[in-house]
Design a protein with these regions (language model features):
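ATP-dependent adenylation/nucleotidyltransferase module used to activate substrates
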Residues: 1-98, 104-107, 134-142
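An accessory alpha-helical subdomain
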Residues: 166-185
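A short, hydrophobic C-terminal helix/tail in secreted or cell-surface proteins
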Residues: 191-194
């Protein structure tokens, strides 16, 4: 419709990557992809890796790293006057988060598709929340997008990786489990929003 077209035209895209400071992370592919689709791109350089791994020396650094990354991003968004951010969380991320919440927190929670964060003045949207990780991976391959290699020292041995492997095992032994968890998780989430 014309109204939808007008809304779409008013949206401006601006891509930002938070560089946490791990050696060997190369964002050149991200920059080139953004240039190819005419989207401005900026890399926010931080010392988060140093803070998390040298200053704090936490055995499970993911939570602190995530908080610091988000803080750096929200700060930059505020400086730019941007009030929305789209995260690339996919269906598998949603399911893994629900499983992690159940295992480690004793509650059934996962992130909603849209969240307003009043302290940051930012609305978080997750446009790929219903897309399986394999669908995202196939798109990336088909488009020839260069993936940034994660050089975090704990990559592959995190609570999220454990939840991912556990969910894969459960789904192998009980085919369709992933597809059944998503709507239940989302329904539960919606029931607790009100």
């Amino acid at each position: 419709s014309s109204a939808a077209s007008d809304v779409y035209k008013r949206q401006e895209l601006y891509a930002i990557t938070c560089n946490v400071g791990f050696e060997g992370m190369d964002f050149t592919g991200v920059r080139k992809f953004c240039e190819s689709i005419n989207v401005p791109y900026e890399q926010v350089d931080t010392e988060i890796a140093k803070i998390v791994f040298e200053d704090n020396k936490d055995e499970r650094p993911c939570s602190l790293c995530a908080k610091l990354r988000k803080g750096a991003m929200y700060k930059r968004l505020g400086e730019l006057g941007i009030n929305k951010i789209a995260y690339a969380h996919n269906k598998d991320d949603f399911i893994e988060t629900a499983l992690m919440s159940l295992i480690y927190e004793g509650r059934f929670y996962a992130f909603p598709p849209v969240t307003y964060l009043p302290e940051a003045g930012v609305t978080v949207i997750r446009p790929m929340m219903y897309v399986p990780e394999k669908g995202v991976a196939n798109f990336v391959i088909n488009q020839g997008i260069k993936v940034v290699k994660n050089t975090c020292p704990v990559d592959g041995s995190t609570k999220r990786e454990y939840a991912k492997q556990l969910m894969e095992q459960i789904n192998r032994e009980n085919p369709g489990t992933k597809d059944r968890i998503m709507p239940v998780s989302y329904t539960h989430l919606r029931a607790h929003e009100t």
